[in-house]
C-alpha cells in the first residue's frame, strides 16, 4: 500500500508540474490543434490549443513506476521490483502512445487535422498489439502463472471458454486475434471519447481507479494467500503491481486534468488517447477481467456504439442520421447543452458504469464464498 501512495504522489506531481512546462514548449514551437470545420462551431475557438499532452501523462507514468520501485528497493532490498505484467502493460501503453504521437506530429507539422492514414495507423497498432499478445503468454512465475491465458475471462478465467480448444497453436492464434479486438476496441473507444475538454481524462481516472481497487482485492484474495477466503481466490500474476500502475495512471491523469479541464490549456491528443486505451486494454487482459471491460469502460462502449449506429444507419438509409452528430457527446452539444454540462453528465455516466462493473466483480466473489 505504501508503494501505491508513493507512486500516485510522484505521478501527480510530475503531471502537475510537467504539463505547464510542456505547454510553454508547444506554444513556443507553435504546435497547436487544428479543428475540423465540420465539427461544432463552438470548437472553432479551440484552434491552436497545444496538443500531444498525453506525452506528459506517459512520461509521468514511466517516471513514477520506476522511481517507486527504486524507493521500495532502497527501503527493502528484497522487494520484488518491476513485474512481467507491469512491464508488458507499459509496453502496450508506450507502443500505442507512440503511434498516437506520430499521428499528432504529422498533424501539427502539416498544419492540418489529418495525421497518419487509416492503413498505416491500423498496421502500426496491429504490430504493437500482436507483439503484446504473444509476450503475455510467456514469462511464467515460480508457480507457473503467466501474465495472461487463452481462456476468455469475465471476473476471472472461464474454463469452458478456452481458445486453446484446438490445441496450443490454435489457441495462441485465436488469443492474438481476441487480444487485438480488445485493444482496438479500447483504443478507439478512448480516442472517440476525447472530444471535449476533460471528458476522456475524467472518465479514465474512474476506470483506472476501479482497476486499482480490483488489483488490491485480487492480491488480498490470491490463491495461497493467508487472507484467502472461500473458493473465490484469484489466479492473477502480479496483481499488486497492476494496482500500482492503475493508481499511478489515475494520479497522472488527475494532474493532467488540472490543465485539461474547460477551458483546456492543452489537449491529450492521440498520443494520450491511444496510450490510455492501450493501458485500459492491458488491464482487462492482465487482470483476467476481459468481458468486464464492457461495464468498467461502459462510457467508451456507449460512445463507440453511437458512431457505429450513426455510420451504419447513414449507409442503410441512404443518408439519414440517428444523431445530430457522432460521437454522442457532440449530439448533445448541438442540442444546446453547454460543453461543461455534457462533460459532467458523461462523467456521471462513467462513474455509474464503473460502479456496476465493481459490483459485478465483488458479487461474483461473494457468491463463491
From Swiss-Prot:
Reaction(s) the record says it catalyses: UDP-N-acetyl-alpha-D-muramoyl-L-alanyl-gamma-D-glutamyl-meso-2,6-diaminopimeloyl-D-alanyl-D-alanine + di-trans,octa-cis-undecaprenyl phosphate = di-trans,octa-cis-undecaprenyl diphospho-N-acetyl-alpha-D-muramoyl-L-alanyl-D-glutamyl-meso-2,6-diaminopimeloyl-D-alanyl-D-alanine + UMP
Pfam families for this protein: Glycos_transf_4 (PF00953), MraY_sig1 (PF10555)
Compartments, record wording: Cell membrane
Transmembrane segments: 2-22, 55-75, 86-106, 120-140, 163-183, 196-216, 239-259, 266-286, 291-311, 348-368
Cofactor(s) required for function per UniProt: Mg(2+)
Keywords associated with the record: Cell cycle, Cell division, Cell membrane, Cell shape, Cell wall biogenesis/degradation, Magnesium, Membrane, Metal-binding, Peptidoglycan synthesis, Transferase, Transmembrane, Transmembrane helix
Pathway: Cell wall biogenesis; peptidoglycan biosynthesis
Membrane-topology descriptor: Multi-pass membrane protein
CDD domains according to UniProt: GT_MraY
GO MF term list: metal ion binding; phospho-N-acetylmuramoyl-pentapeptide-transferase activity; UDP-N-acetylmuramoyl-L-alanyl-D-glutamyl-meso-2,6-diaminopimelyl-D-alanyl-D-alanine:undecaprenyl-phosphate transferase activity
PROSITE patterns per record: MRAY_2
One example of a Gene Ontology biological process annotation: cell wall organization
Enzyme Commission identifier(s): 2.7.8.13
GO CC terms in record: plasma membrane
HAMAP family given in the database record: MraY (MF_00038)
Database matches in NCBIfam families: mraY
Entry function: Catalyzes the initial step of the lipid cycle reactions in the biosynthesis of the cell wall peptidoglycan: transfers peptidoglycan precursor phospho-MurNAc-pentapeptide from UDP-MurNAc-pentapeptide onto the lipid carrier undecaprenyl phosphate, yielding undecaprenyl-pyrophosphoryl-MurNAc-pentapeptide, known as lipid I.
UniProt family annotation: Belongs to the glycosyltransferase 4 family. MraY subfamily.
Protein name, as recorded: Phospho-N-acetylmuramoyl-pentapeptide-transferase
Upper lineage: Bacteria, Bacillati, Actinomycetota, Actinomycetes, Micrococcales
Amino acid at each position: 500500500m505504501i508503494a501505491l501512495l508513493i507512486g500516485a504522489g510522484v505521478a501527480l506531481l510530475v503531471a502537475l508540474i510537467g504539463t505547464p512546462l510542456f505547454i510553454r514548449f508547444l506554444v513556443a514551437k507553435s504546435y497547436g490543434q487544428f479543428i475540423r470545420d465540420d465539427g461544432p462551431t463552438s470548437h472553432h475557438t479551440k484552434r491552436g490549443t497545444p496538443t500531444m499532452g498525453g506525452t506528459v501523462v506517459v512520461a509521468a507514468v514511466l517516471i513514477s513506476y520506476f522511481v517507486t520501485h527504486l524507493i521500495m528497493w532502497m527501503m527493502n532490498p528484497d522487494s520484488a521490483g518491476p513485474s512481467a505484467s507491469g512491464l508488458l502493460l507499459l509496453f502496450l501503453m508506450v507502443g500505442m502512445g507512440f503511434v498516437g504521437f506520430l499521428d499528432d506530429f504529422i498533424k501539427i507539422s502539416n498544419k492540418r487535422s489529418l495525421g497518419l492514414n487509416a492503413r498505416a495507423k491500423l498496421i502500426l497498432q496491429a504490430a504493437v498489439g500482436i507483439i503484446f499478445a504473444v509476450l503475455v503468454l510467456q514469462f511464467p512465475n515460480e508457480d507457473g502463472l503467466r501474465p495472461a491465458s487463452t481462456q476468455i475471462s469475465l471476473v476471472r478465467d472461464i474454463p469452458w471458454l478456452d481458445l486453446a480448444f484446438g490445441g496450443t497453436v490454435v489457441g495462441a492464434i485465436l488469443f492474438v486475434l481476441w487480444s487485438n479486438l480488445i485493444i482496438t476496441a479500447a483504443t478507439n473507444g478512448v480516442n472517440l471519447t476525447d472530444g471535449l475538454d476533460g471528458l476522456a481524462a475524467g472518465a479514465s481516472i474512474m476506470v483506472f481507479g476501479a482497476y486499482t481497487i480490483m488489483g488490491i482485492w485480487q492480491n488480498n484474495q490470491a490463491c495461497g494467500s493467508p487472507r484467502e477466503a472461500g473458493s473465490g481466490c484469484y489466479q492473477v500474476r502480479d496483481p499488486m503491481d497492476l494496482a500500482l500502475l492503475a493508481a499511478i495512471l489515475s494520479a497522472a491523469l488527475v494532474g493532467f486534468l488540472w490543465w485539461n479541464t474547460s477551458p483546456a490549456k492543452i489537449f491529450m491528443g492521440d498520443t494520450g488517447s491511444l496510450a490510455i486505451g492501450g493501458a485500459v486494454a492491458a488491464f482487462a487482459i492482465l487482470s483476467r477481467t476481459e468481458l468486464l471491460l464492457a461495464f468498467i469502460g461502459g462510457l467508451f462502449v456507449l460512445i463507440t456504439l453511437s458512431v457505429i449506429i450513426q455510420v451504419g444507419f447513414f449507409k442503410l438509409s441512404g443518408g439519414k442520421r440517428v444523431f445530430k452528430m457522432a460521437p454522442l457527446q457532440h449530439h448533445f452539444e448541438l442540442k444546446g447543452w453547454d460543453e461543461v454540462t455534457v462533460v459532467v453528465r458523461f462523467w456521471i455516466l462513467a462513474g455509474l458504469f464503473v460502479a456496476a462493473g465493481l459490483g459485478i466483480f465483488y458479487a461474483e466473489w461473494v457468491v463463491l464464498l
